[in-house]
UniProtKB/Swiss-Prot annotation:
Keywords: Antibiotic, Antimicrobial, Disulfide bond, Fungicide, Lectin, Mannose-binding, Plant defense, Signal
Organism: Pinus pinaster (Maritime pine)
Domain (Gnk2-homologous) ranges: 27-129
Annotated signal peptide: 1-23
GO MF assignments: D-mannose binding
Name of the gene this protein is made from: EAP
Binding of alpha-D-mannopyranose, residues: N35, R114, E125
One GO BP annotation of this record: defense response to bacterium
Protein name: Antifungal protein ginkbilobin-like protein
Record's function text: Exerts antifungal activity through its carbohydrate-binding specificity.
Amino acid sequence: MRYSFGFTLAVMVVALVVGSAVGTPRTNLVSSACNGQKIQSGSSFYSTLGSLLVDLEGNTASSGYDYKASRAGSPTAYGRAVCNQGLSQSDCTACLKNLGGRIWNICGYAIGARVQLTDCFIRYEQYSF
């Protein structure tokens, strides 16, 4: 059976569109901005920030793909996470968990950071924004 070039091309385009809409999130580093000040060793901010990142990772997808939160501490940690709205909820969460695991390496324990992957973004600071 022979298929026309147009039919073959249409099948390939549909496969690419479906493949990009379903599957793993794209986690290539797009940009980062890291505060030059670092979290002090033994600082309570480290655990406060860790708790905030877990909250952002776990609640962004179920909160409309754009979620802000804070964790009381000394100092308080403020954060925001955003996902590409074309992702499934599980892919949004997976992207943010990937980023949460890499943010320390990208920004070297900075007291504030903004990191954008292709399909998700996290920002955290010691001040409200």
